[in-house]
């Protein structure tokens, strides 16, 4: 498809080279716009990627200091803000593109319906015209037999493009429907432009002027036909009276031979004039009957076309409902995916916050542990310094005497100063418990 498009665009011998040049210029603008937008997005993503790389590099060499932790927190907040800003910008762009896509689809649907209506209208109108032409001969209608108002109305229709004023039936019906809805007030212009995307405001204003003139001429035509019917009825009564008088006149003078020839000639002239008036009236009646027949056929064809359009609109309505249902299902699916993505993102954010919180806690514990170890090392070093100072104060001037190892110690000498009985004599008395007086003299049973 891209190849066919370029073959039309760059074909110098094409009949639509000017239109293709305009499309080519528009396409180049859109391509440049897409390139600029792509470069901007790549720049934003590269910036976020670099910040993430810096954060990863900082996490490889963790320092248990409050300044380092604060720096990591600032870097994470900066990355999070950049990602949220990027997502919000893209969301707004996508929403705008979706609105433009819906508007374009509505315009394409309206144009497609219009083309289908043209196809149906042209074929059916041609069939109806052939049927009417075969039923009634054309030479029966002459401009001289029709009233002036009818001729003006028909001439106006021929000069301005028929009963739709040169518009197709779909656009004209929408125009009339909206105009009747607002009862002809000027406020209906804006709504007409919404229903007819292919028409400009000047075209709608010109069609409104034409339609006002059309209604005025049609009203004059109806009044003229009504007046013609009244006159026809009056002439019919006059002709009937003349015929009745002509039939009764010979009977009145039948028995009078003295009637002269002059009266007979006058009577014949009156009869001839009455017959000519009757023929002319018949011709006018046939012309009006044919015009009425044409109008009836036109009304029937219009009803048939309205019925076809109604069925076609029902079909389009069904298709639109089906399409709308599919779009709604797709929208719900996308909303579900979006909601799931948001939940996952929220979970990831919660996990990231938890990891960050745990990392901060671990860093705090590590910092406390390092501080405790440092305090113990400082205390130990201080103790060593204190002992060294004490050693420096004490003087050791003891001479070496190996023979003192064989001498008794002071403690031993103190023990040997007082020596008690050795206990080597015979054991003559063994102490026993005293015997109560009331048991003395009682022998012990064995």
Curated annotation (Swiss-Prot):
Quote the biased-composition stretches of kind Basic and acidic residues, using this chain's numbering: 255-268
The answer to whether the entry has keyword Coiled coil is yes
At the top level, the lineage of the source is: Eukaryota
Where is the protein localized?
Cytoplasm, Cytoskeleton, Microtubule organizing center, Centrosome, Centriolar satellite
Protein known as? Coiled-coil domain-containing protein 112
Q: Name one GO cellular component term.
A: centriolar satellite
Q: What is its main location?
A: cytoplasm
Q: Name the source organism.
A: Macaca fascicularis (Crab-eating macaque)
- UniProt entry keywords in alphabetical sequence: Coiled coil, Cytoplasm, Cytoskeleton
Q: Where is this region: Disordered?
A: 247-277, 394-430
Q: Give coiled-coil spans as residue ranges.
A: 23-116, 219-400
Q: Which InterPro entries match?
A: CCDC148/CCDC112 (IPR039902)
The keyword Cytoplasm is annotated on this UniProt entry? yes
Species lineage, top-down? Eukaryota, Metazoa, Chordata, Craniata, Vertebrata
